[in-house]
């Protein structure tokens, strides 16, 4: 699964340096909690790559601190989960790959 993901990696959107810098500033407040081999996580990561987004990923299977953050903040150890922190510092935990992809496409496409 991971090999197929690497071999068929999607091309990203090409933006002007200024536009990409703006997108990077917006994605600095996003974190994707994942398991590396989860097919739904791979789907979310491919959408992130396709949209040329610089989103931090945390492996909730191998990193105990990430797993505890996910459980404490989101209430479930379910992946993928996108942690969204807004300008006011409020945090939303979004589960389900389809919802995550729709959110990212709506905001950054």
Regions found by a protein language model. Give the residues of each.
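GST-like domain detector, emphasizing the conserved glutathione-binding G-site
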Residues: 1-37, 42-109
């Amino acid at each position: 699964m991971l090999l197929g993901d690497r071999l068929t990696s999607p091309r990203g959107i090409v933006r002007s340096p200024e536009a990409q810098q703006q997108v990077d500033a917006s994605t600095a407040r996003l974190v994707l909690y994942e398991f590396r081999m989860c097919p739904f996580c791979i789907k979310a990561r491919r959408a992130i790559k396709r949209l040329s987004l610089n989103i931090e990923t945390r492996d909730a299977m191998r990193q105990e601190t990430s797993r505890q953050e996910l459980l404490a903040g989101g209430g479930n150890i379910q992946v993928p989960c996108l942690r969204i922190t807004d300008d006011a510092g409020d945090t939303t935990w979004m589960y389900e790959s389809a919802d995550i992809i729709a959110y990212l496409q709506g905001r950054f496409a």
